[in-house]
Amino acid sequence: MIELEKIPHIHEISNHGPYHGAREKNTATFQARSTRQNKLVPSLEEAIRRTGLKDGMTISFHHHFRNGDHIINTVVDKLAEMGYKNLTLAASSLAAVHAPLIRHIQNGVITHIETSGMRGELAEQVSRGLIDCPVVFRSHGGRASAIRSGDLHIDVAFLGAPSCDPYGNANGYSRDDEDGIACGSLGYARTDATYADNVIVITNHLVAYPNAPWAIPEFEVDYVVMTDDIGDPKGIMSGATRYTKDPKELLIAKTAANVIEAAGYLYDGFSMQMGSGGASLATARFLRQKMIDQNIHCRFALGGITGQIAAMHEEGLIDRILDVQSFDLDAAKSLKNNHFHHQISASYYASHMVAAAVDQLDFVILSLSLIHISEPTRH
């Protein structure tokens, strides 16, 4: 028997002594544990109650289903039914499909909104004074930084996932169901999952453990809820992610590609990001032809990823894809099937608090609804 008291400086060592933290061996089989000892909760209402959500707290959502999302409306409807008030809604973005939130703002269920974008009737009503408190808009990278720093504290994150196992390993697609719903990358959800006090994964497709590969690991998930409907993947490719045939937008795209080339940024091993919007997405088509003509390739493409970028990767024109959001179903399929199509978090993508992938870009093509160009100041 070792006499601990005789060991020199023993009292300067914290938590010294025999280890008493060992748990009794669980002799149940894997199948039995998966059935009985998991994170599955019988209903959304029960999961909400278990989180301890209270009036005045902050709830978050991702927008990877874009205009096909059904999670936000379903959850806020339930919260209203349960009597919650004065909640802050912190979604990574809000689309036209979220117009039903208007009545929940009018009824005091939602009193604050923090997001990165807002469209449709909800945006129109907010612009006309629907909500008393100013809406906080952040860039996607700014939102990730605010969550990481604690400026945006999330009490409960409600994260829709096209596949999840009983322990919470969740992903934006399923390898067990070729025909199932898919949204591709869960990049914006990953930051919420990491820093939220409570995380509820809502899925329509429960798979056996382990759901590998996963976007969100089980140790970041508190509860898993099964539902019949999380969203319509056809809504992913809508509005800002459309393919354009507009002659004006095509002219803008062609000109942008020419400017990139003339500026010296189209070289062998360059890096790029293509944003949403018809002209922005069309620019990739013109760049592709220039790359083929000049026999050059792109080292990596970043950001919201389209099937067009995925096709260029499969052609060998792009070495790596860093995907924070899949803009269409072809991109989601590529993420599932292509080894060098990587899923990244919003923090990895563009947080100013850490070294981010945007810092390595040669150029970015983005589309804006409105640009104000002022006259230069004359002295």
Predicted segments with their positions:
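Conserved alpha/beta enzyme-core scaffold
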Residues: M1-S374, R378
